[in-house]
Amino acid sequence: MTFDRDVILLDDLSSSIKNPKSRLYESNIGYIEVYEPKEIEKSLELIQSRLENGIHAVCCFSYNLGLVFQGLPPKASLLNSPLIRAWFFKEYRKLSATEVDEWIESRLDLERTQQAEIDGGIVDVNFEIDEKTFCENIDSIHSEIRKGETYQVNYTFNITGKTYGSTIGLYKRLRQRQRCRYGALICCEGNRILSFSPEL
């Protein structure tokens, strides 16, 4: 997938000209990856130290990190992914929703001049579980809620596939089709992460 420059966009659709909330980070000055549980504490201390010295950090924490904190075995399907990823920047720009739209279009225009494929998409989609397992798991969650064992479960499973074309083109398509308040576009140090969520 094409993208010629390190960039992170933390997108907030409620952002306005009077109250710009979206953040655009460019030109990162450092990056760390953590795979081993024994490195977690030292890495968190490093992140905190940089924050205290006026450096901005954007971090991605794996679901497996939560399991490590609870003393539970990590999820096998996530073993090859970092527990922590953190990118560091000297500054960022605040953008309104309109300015984010304009920034996306300017990036796509740049890709057009480079004769890159600006359409982005996903093919060969595979679900980690089948429909029967999904329904059984949801029934089990409903049962636990009825018994008062829990009041809410954020149920997730992996969906894998292959992407093609422009990373930002794919982000634009998903942003239009999956309208929710928050989004993230991370294109740094070879990482390509696109995320959408109704809550922070």
Set out the residue ranges of the language-model regions.
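Extended alpha-helical targeting/anchoring segments
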Residues: M1-L200
